[in-house]
Amino acid sequence: LLLKPYYSIKNVTIDGYINALDDFEALIIADPKTPFSEADLFTIDQFVMKGGDLMCFMNTLDIKNDTLYAQGYTHSTRKNLRLEHMLFDYGFKINDNLIMDVNSIPKYDPRFDESRLNWYYQVLSTNTKHPIVKNIEPVGMEYVNQIEFTNDNVKPILTSSTNSNRSGLAPIVELNMSFNFDDKDPKLVSNPNDKKNQLWA
């Protein structure tokens, strides 16, 4: 909605149509839930190859919050969107893990009245000096994957803080996870001030 005064924004369904994106300059894929077909991936790839801009806001893991609240934990499962395979060809590897960051947004704990957890899975981004984000407030990102790049000529826009770490592949997400760390001085890594700990998200 904030972009409407400056851009013409429309929803588009590719549905295997090779020319579905011909009238667009940029494509935003936001929180996809189901796998992309080979035909749709081919159309998107051709759009990018012809100079179209592509923005993907996605997570490769599915986390059921209702199960998390009911049982105190939940298994994360891979969405297998197939889009990540195309992005890998562009030099972006999206790992099937989760970033945990002390710089995070607290989460309401439904098991206790007015109780909030240090919810390290809801990362509060550390903005870089990139012109796109340098004048905006930090962005909250829940259940965010780590991104790796095969190309060194990449400028990160949003990262985690230096006091962050990554989970294993497809982890179990637990509400009690936060109690495993010292609330007064939580450290997810042994050297929480080292910039090498910053993860791209």
Predicted features, each with a name:
Residues 1-201:
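Acidic, S/T/G-rich, low-cysteine, solvent-exposed domains in lumenal/extracellular/periplasmic regions
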